[in-house]
């Protein structure tokens, strides 16, 4: 039985669910879950939690993500990416803007911004996914959402051809960010229709492309009994949370028994959630949170016996 986090390289054409389904067959275990959907046409890093690591999948999902995308100015689509039908065209020429204009524009997207999720997305409105409305040619008001663009920059020259302009960007962002919506919004600010023509997720949950294995590589390593060496411990998925190392065996026992604590037992360091780590084994003991009605206390959220 495997336990740990496995960064998978999801190839284009597969859904995130396809990856989990195939892994369950390869590894012969059902206890597998991915940490955030990647659209079928998007390639890149998809961390997968296996065995007891499924208990930290939410925390891996909450960690930052990084993408490399190609923005295409001059044509918009129904899906905001290359898979959709053309909505609008407007010829773009090198006299319309230059790379300095693009760089200044990209700076304006840094920080907390508002996005309207695309119609072809799994965001739910009134209990129904937006893509279900879109497939039925129904329109519905889409709620604006705040997302965090931690960094964004151009990583290629501008390529003007066939009345369009194409360039690559790198984006570091929080969860829930739609890069294709970002591409269309870049076009709006330039005064042109636009879409995202290619996307690769280069980092997710602290895992990068070079860490990631294809399904074929995973199958081969499993057959050689050497896959466990490629898994990251579940503790890796909690590195975004503050932690305290516990030496006292009596306190360790209380933690593993799920007892409540007064915050002042830990110098009031705990603001929201805290990970308790065994000082001897470096293994996580539990995740605690501030008590919802007694702010001076902390209570267990997850205990790892």
UniProtKB/Swiss-Prot annotation:
The active site is at residue 39. It catalyses: uridine(55) in tRNA = pseudouridine(55) in tRNA. GO terms for biological process: mRNA pseudouridine synthesis; tRNA pseudouridine synthesis. GO terms for molecular function: RNA binding; tRNA pseudouridine(55) synthase activity. Keywords: Isomerase, tRNA processing. It is an enzyme of class 5 (isomerase). Its EC number is 5.4.99.25. PANTHER family: PSEUDOURIDYLATE SYNTHASE TRUB1 (PTHR13767:SF2), TRNA-PSEUDOURIDINE SYNTHASE (PTHR13767). Belongs to the pseudouridine synthase TruB family. Type 1 subfamily. Responsible for synthesis of pseudouridine from uracil-55 in the psi GC loop of transfer RNAs. This is tRNA pseudouridine synthase B. It comes from Staphylococcus aureus (strain MSSA476). The gene is truB.
């Amino acid at each position: 039985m495997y336990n740990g986090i496995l960064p998978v390289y999801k190839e284009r054409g597969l859904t995130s669910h396809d990856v989990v389904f195939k892994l369950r067959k390869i590894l012969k275990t059902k206890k597998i879950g991915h940490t955030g959907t990647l659209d079928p046409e998007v390639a890149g890093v998809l961390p997968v939690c296996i065995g007891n690591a499924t208990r930290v999948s939410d925390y891996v999902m909450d960690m930052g993500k990084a993408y490399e995308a190609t923005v295409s100015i001059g044509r918009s689509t129904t899906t905001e990416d290359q898979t959709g039908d053309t909505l609008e065209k407007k010829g773009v020429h090198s006299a319309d803007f230059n790379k300095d204009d693009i760089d200044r524009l990209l700076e304006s997207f840094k920080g907390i911004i508002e996005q309207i999720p695309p119609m072809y997305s799994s965001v739910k409105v009134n209990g129904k996914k937006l893509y279900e409305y879109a497939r039925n040619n129904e329109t519905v008001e889409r709620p604006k959402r705040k997302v965090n663009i931690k960094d964004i920059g151009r990583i290629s020259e501008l390529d003007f051809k066939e009345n369009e302009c194409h360039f690559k960007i790198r984006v570091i962002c929080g969860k829930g960010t739609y890069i294709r919506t970002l591409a269309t919004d870049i076009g709006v600010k330039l005064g042109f229709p636009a879409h995202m023509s290619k996307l690769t997720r280069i980092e997710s949950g602290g895992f990068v492309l070079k860490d990631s294995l294809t399904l074929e590589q995973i199958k081969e390593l499993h057959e050689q009994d050497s896959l466990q060496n490629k898994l990251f411990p579940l503790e890796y998925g909690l590195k975004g949370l503050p932690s305290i190392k516990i030496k006292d065996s009596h306190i360790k026992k209380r933690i593993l028994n799920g007892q409540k604590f007064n915050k002042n037992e830990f110098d009031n360091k705990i603001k929201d959630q805290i990970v308790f780590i065994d000082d001897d084994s470096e293994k996580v003991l539990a995740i605690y949170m501030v008590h919802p009605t007694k702010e001076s206390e902390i209570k267990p959220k997850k205990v790892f016996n």
